């Protein structure tokens, strides 16, 4: 073996050793940055699995290079503003089977345009801010939530790229129209535009009118009672004055009798 072959062989060995060392450092770095209670692996990108970890909130120390994030089957109740803003490589986000009730307006800021799959099914979401899913390109699963079907929900679903697929399994737990409760959202939206419902101004006008009539009636009754009381007082005074007049009228007769 000549010197060139020997040098190439040693160079190749050094490169392989250096590569292995770099990979070990990366793995150690990823493991050291893994949130408490979660498992991290680097198969096809950094996968962070925090399923069934009894988490009550979304960890704030998630590695920036996270690609797949599983937070399902925990006790998370809300998604705060910009909680994922540093996860620019995030593609899959699973938040199913939690107790999520609140999603802040800017909850998905920073990942809305890169996220491919978002699972929010089996939570307690009734409504969200109309801008919460703005620019979201992900295939979203939001079924099995106690949705309140109204104009805001209609606007939210229209703003999502996968509107029809996302809305397909949404059931109205409650609705601005009572007859839509328990029905699929798409059926409710086909029956009526939830953002263009007639306002119930007639009821208020009726109440104002009834209150006006009621006030007039009460005023008339009060006036009538007071007027009757005044008439009764005058009549009573008149009656009291009658005996004295009769007595004065009888006095001349008594005098003539004595004479």
From Swiss-Prot:
It is found in: Membrane. Residues 1-33 form the signal peptide. Residues 145-197 form the LRRCT domain. Residues 34-64 form the LRRNT domain. It comes from the Eukaryota. InterPro entries: Leu-rich_rpt, Leu-rich_rpt_typical-subtyp, LRR_dom_sf, LRRNT. LRR repeats lie at residues 65-86, 89-110, 114-135. Keywords: Glycoprotein, Leucine-rich repeat, Membrane, Repeat, Signal, Transmembrane, Transmembrane helix. Glycans are attached at residues 47, 94. It is a single-pass membrane protein. The chain crosses the membrane at residues 205-225. It holds the Pfam family LRR_1. One of its GO terms (cellular component) is membrane. Belongs to the LRRC3 family. This is Leucine-rich repeat-containing protein 3B. It comes from Mus musculus.
């Amino acid at each position: 073996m000549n010197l060139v072959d020997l040098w190439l062989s040693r160079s190749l060995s050094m490169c392989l050793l250096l590569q292995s060392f770099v990979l070990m450092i990366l793995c150690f770095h990823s493991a050291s940055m893994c949130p408490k209670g979660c498992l991290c692996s680097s198969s096809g990108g950094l996968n962070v699995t925090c399923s069934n970890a009894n988490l009550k909130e979304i960890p704030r120390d998630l590695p920036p290079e996270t690609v797949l994030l599983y937070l399902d089957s925990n006790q998370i109740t809300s998604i705060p503003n910009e909680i994922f803003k540093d996860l620019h490589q995030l593609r899959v986000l699973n938040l199913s089977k939690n107790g999520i009730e609140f999603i802040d307006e800017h909850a998905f800021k920073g990942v809305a345009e890169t996220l491919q799959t978002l699972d929010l099914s089996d939570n307690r979401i009734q409504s969200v801010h109309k801008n919460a899913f703005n620019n979201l390109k992900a295939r979203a699963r939001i079924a099995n939530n106690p949705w309140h079907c109204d104009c805001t929900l209609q606007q939210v679903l229209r703003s999502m790229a996968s509107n029809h697929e996302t809305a397909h399994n949404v059931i109205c737990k409650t609705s601005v129209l009572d007859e839509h409760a328990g029905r699929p959202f798409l059926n409710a939206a086909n029956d009526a535009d939830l953002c263009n419902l007639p306002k119930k101004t007639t009821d208020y006008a009726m109440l104002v009118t009834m209150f006006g009539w009621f006030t007039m009636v009460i005023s008339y009754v009060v006036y009538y009672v007071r007027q009757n009381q005044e008439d009764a007082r005058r009549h009573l005074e008149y009656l009291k004055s009658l005996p004295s007049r009769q007595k004065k009228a009888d006095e001349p007769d008594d005098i003539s009798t004595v004479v």
